[in-house]
Amino acid sequence: FPYQGSSIILESGNVNDYEVVYPRKVTALPKGAVQQKYEDAMQYEFKVNGEPVVLHLEKNKGLFSKDYSEIHYSPDGRRITTHPLVEDHCYYRGHIRNDADSTASISACNGLKGHFKLRGETYLIEPMKISNSEAHAVYKYENVEKEDEAHKMCGVTQNWESYEPIKKASQLIVSTEFQRYMEIVIVVDHSMYTKYKGDSDKIKAWVYEMINTISESYRYLYIDIIVSALEMWSEKDLINVETSAENTLKSFGEWRAKDLIHRISHDNAQLLTATDFDGPTIGLAYVASMCDPKRSVGVVQDHSSVNHLVAITLAHEIAHNLGVHHDEGSCSCGSGYTCIMSPVINSEVIKYFSDCSYIQCREYISKENPPCILNKPLRTDTVSTPVSGNELLEAGKDYD
C-alpha cells in the first residue's frame, strides 16, 4: 500500500496502515431522468495499491418494508411511532468492475463507508475526518488496532442444539421456490441508546449499515432480509436486560410475544444492547425457531467499533433461528476464509456462510417450512415498479 503517515483515528478505531483515495463519481443519468438524492445505480473510480478500480453500486431496494416504522418513547413513557419515507435511502450493494469474484456493501450517506472485496482481499473504506475534503481511507481490517484481543463467542452451546446428519450440497435441489422473505424488527435497548448519546440518526445509520451488510450474506441462502421497524428504548428498557445473555433472551422473547407482535407485522426480532454479557458471549439465539412468537428472537452485544463485526454477529444469531448450527471442522466457505457460523468471532472480516450452513438452512426450510417467511412483502419502491397482481400480497399476516 502506498500509505500516508502512520496512524489515523477513524470511526472504526485507530488504523495503522491506510491508503488515501479520492473517489470520483462517474455515473451519467439518462436524458430526462429525475435526479434523486441517491440514484438507483452509481459508479465511483479510485485507486487501490496504485491500480484504478471502478466500484459499481446498486441501491438495495428491498432493504425496508412498505410500512416501515420507527418507534421511540417520550419522557412520560408514551410510545411515538413514525413512518419515515425511506425510498430515497443511501444503502448500496455492488462489485468492482472486471473482477467476477468481487462484492461490495456500501452506505453512500456521507461519503462512502463500508467494505468491498477486490482480488480475494477484503478492504474497508470510510471518509476521513477532514472538512471540505473528498478524502477517504481504504484499509484492511487487520490494520485496525484491536480494542481487546479476548475471544468473543456465540453463547449457543451443544445442549441448545440437536445435530443431525447433513446431506451433501449436491443432494439438494435448489429452485426459486426456495426464496424466502424475512421481515425483521431491530430493538435498540437503553444502554445502546445511551452509548450513542441519544443520537437517533447515528443509531439508525449504524443499524441500517449492518442490515445492508447481512442482506448481502443472506442472498446466498436465498433469503431476503427486510427491515419492518426500528424500535429505540429511549427512556428506559422495557425488559430486564441482564449480563446473562440467556435470561435477556428469554425476557426479550416473552416481551415480543406479549407486546411487539401485536403492533408490528414481522417475522423475527433482534435486540441490540451495549450491555457486556457474561464471559466471552456476544450473542445468543434460539435454534430452529423462526415464526415462533417467543423464540424467533436473538440478542446481540454491540461489541465492536467496526460495524461489520457486529453485523456478522447479528447474521450469525438470525441463522440460528433458521436452524443453522455452528460450523465444525470440515465446513468451508472458500479457501482460507472464516465463515459466519464459526463459534468464535476472530479478528478478520467474515462475509460468507459455509456449505454446511447452506445445507442446514435449506433442510430446515424444506422440513419445517416456517410459514411467516413465505410471503413477499411490499417493497418501498412498489409504487413506481410495475408488478404482477399476484405479487401484491398483503403484508400484515404474521400471527393471526
From Swiss-Prot:
Keywords carried by this UniProt record: Calcium, Disulfide bond, Hemostasis impairing toxin, Hydrolase, Metal-binding, Metalloprotease, Protease, Secreted, Signal, Toxin, Zinc, Zymogen
EC number assigned by the record: 3.4.24.-
Subcellular location: Secreted
Domain Peptidase M12B: 180-377
Any one of the GO CC terms: extracellular region
Cystine crosslinks: 291-372, 331-356, 333-339
An annotated GO BP: proteolysis
Binding site for Ca(2+) 1: 183, 267, 372, 375
Residues annotated to bind Zn(2+): 316, 320, 326
Expression sites by tissue: Expressed by the venom gland.
Residues in the signal sequence: 1-6
Sequence positions that bind Ca(2+) 2: 387, 390, 392, 394, 400
Active-site residues, record numbering mapped to chain: 317
Cofactor note: Binds 1 zinc ion per subunit.
One Pfam family linked to the record: Pep_M12B_propep
Record-stated family: Belongs to the venom metalloproteinase (M12B) family. P-I subfamily.
Function: Snake venom metalloproteinase that impairs hemostasis in the envenomed animal.
Subunit structure: Monomer.
Protein name: Snake venom metalloproteinase H1
